[in-house]
């Protein structure tokens, strides 16, 4: 007899009521007396467990009664509806077969574990309630993102993970080399001779697929990328990881306004999709992780996002009377405390901050007519601060070259990027959404290490 997923039983209970069925899964809890016992089984298909009742008439009753948590079992039995019990139904077992035993020292016993402890056993933590919910939501959110863009005719573009350019101009990149670290070989200037390296030049893991994405947007009009990115920032905060995933759409014949409309529509779509398709997980997060989560997400999904320029935001912050840890001044970047004040205290909903000073933004952003600011936007959301950053891209070749010269960038390294402005340049825009930050926002989890399956952070590359 073919086994049935627990999710199917929950979603189609009437179909299986009174039927003999087979399920396969892992023991979450087990309690037994001399005459009968109860097992909570989880098969990974659904957040909730299913209860199995077994009685002393079972052929291997004594053996089953002593099984440890996380033992893999195959259960055959009749599905009985239990309207007067805590659970809606249970399986009355006629046979229980052990697929794989679990040692008694299994670390995830039935008690509350700290997230710090669970990070030490990242290979086992998806079996816990919290992380079962986190990674199921992560999967659904990823699907929602693809569905959102596919429904709108966007082309999914795979940009390279190994790159010779720095899209952010920040320089905090992981270098890739096959040169011998003890004897890399030097050139006449006494510097490492990268012409002898695998790619014949300095290469790194990508910090963004944006530049390559622009090339494809200027061919396909609307594209998006969704893949891993890497930052060699020696940061130990709860918001930073060295390896994370980014969603980066690029849209041609579009300006900053179009960019903001797309970002707002996308974020609302993801929220609505996850709340609709993972109600049990979202209720769990709302009850045990972040008690105001569902109200906050519903507020985001139903609000018209605010709009404020950077200059206006600075004035609001300066006149607020608040004492901030970081001083507020025009020309300095907004810190998380400033972002959260704006979105939580002033607007009380998500807000786009636009038109930042050019000196604190990347070289590729379009210069505004005032000559001092660029057509950039950051989306701030309550509880986190900045979640999306984007801009209209500079489509004027002369202005782009001027900006690169001012920032000391080597134009030869970006020759192909500059060429995009020579052959049918068009206004275009795009943004980046850090996927893990989106998952943190959806789940209420407060540390990025807890929304990545095997986090990579400074001095930590276990598993």
Swiss-Prot record:
PROSITE patterns, per the entry: AA_TRNA_LIGASE_II
Catalyzed reactions: tRNA(Asn) + L-asparagine + ATP = L-asparaginyl-tRNA(Asn) + AMP + diphosphate + H(+)
Localization per record: Cytoplasm
Gene: asnS
MF annotations from Gene Ontology: asparagine-tRNA ligase activity; ATP binding; catalytic activity, acting on a protein; nucleic acid binding; transferase activity
Record-given protein name: Asparagine--tRNA ligase
Keywords associated with the record: Aminoacyl-tRNA synthetase, ATP-binding, Cytoplasm, Ligase, Nucleotide-binding, Protein biosynthesis
One BP term from GO: asparaginyl-tRNA aminoacylation
Lineage: Bacteria, Bacillati, Bacillota, Clostridia, Peptostreptococcales
Subunit-level organization: Homodimer.
Pfam family, one: tRNA-synt_2
SUPFAM superfamilies referenced in this protein's UniProt entry, alphabetically: Class II aaRS and biotin synthetases (SSF55681), Nucleic acid-binding proteins (SSF50249)
Any GO CC annotation of this UniProt entry: cytoplasm
EC number: 6.1.1.22
Source organism: Alkaliphilus oremlandii (strain OhILAs) (Clostridium oremlandii (strain OhILAs))
Protein family: Belongs to the class-II aminoacyl-tRNA synthetase family.
